[in-house]
């Protein structure tokens, strides 16, 4: 099964968020926007990415594909995400 590691960049301050998805990055970005403004999950309200999206406006955020790869376990997917976070931070 394929997955994508992606980054979301705040174009006002160049801060980034790195994530993983099995969906398209466009669908995942729409999900992030939905959670930032309409989440039913209380923890989403305190997520730094979502706070920034609400304060800065979604027009200041862009999503970019970093890597598409085949994975077999959730551990492999998480490991790849951690590698990209370390590489970019």
Predicted regions, residues:
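Structure-specific nucleic-acid interaction/processing domains
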Residues: 1-89
């Amino acid at each position: 099964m394929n997955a994508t590691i992606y980054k979301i960049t705040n174009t006002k301050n160049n801060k980034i968020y790195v994530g993983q998805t099995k969906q398209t990055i466009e669908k995942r970005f729409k999900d992030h926007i939905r959670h930032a403004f309409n989440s039913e999950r209380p923890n989403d309200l305190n997520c730094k990415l979502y706070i920034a999206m609400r304060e800065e406006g979604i027009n200041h955020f862009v999503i970019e594909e970093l890597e598409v790869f085949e994975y077999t376990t959730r551990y492999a997917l998480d490991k790849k995400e951690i590698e990209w976070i370390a590489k970019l931070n």
